[in-house]
Amino acid sequence: RDGKPVIAGDFAIDGVPGTGARITLYFLEPGGSKTGKLLPTGNVQDTITLSDGRTIQVSLVDAANPAVFVKATDLGYEGTELPAFTETDGGVLLNTLEDIRTTAAVMMGFAPSKEAASPAVPKVCMVSAPQTYVASDGRTIKGNSIDIVARTKALAVMHKAYAVTGGICTATAALITGTVANEVVSERAKETNQVTLAHPSGKFDFEICLTNDTGWHVEKAGVARTARPIMKGIAYVKGE
């Protein structure tokens, strides 16, 4: 307004303090951000073997940020567990997700072995069908208001909310026919390409423009955010 960014507003983001003006960000052509392929293995699902001998189905997707997806039910979880859950389960969930993540790192070509995998790439996400649950702040998130429930790691702990790029990858994966995320996402999302993702702190809305004329392709991904000033300073440039 008047040549200056509008900061004040009533738009709120679950997991982010305060409110602000709604700013829609569009990520153009986010597919293959690090691997060069939307589906790094060429498959919508792959079978992997965990360290304990179990075999599970996963989907490897690279959109804005590469990630591996697994169904919560395939690991014996509901999918609505909050980060505090991992403080009382003896590290089982975190260790299992890390096992999956490092296996995917090798499959995506990021590391020669699981032991050499970066702690940050790829991400690992546990997904489940829409269901009612209580968020970290005590609010009830209704199952009919969301399209998919997801949980992800932030390095060595469970993420308290959900990262933007991770959300774009999750929403994209949910709309690619045949992925494990697509098998649990709502029919509403498949019809509208609008995905409301439920995380520990609440909900996150995404708009995915996806085509499949000659293979899956993401034209753009939209997400609403807010902005605020965080610093003000003066840079001094030496004159001639």
What are the language-model segments listed below?
Residues 1-240:
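Non-transmembrane, aqueous-exposed alpha-helical and coiled segments at domain scale
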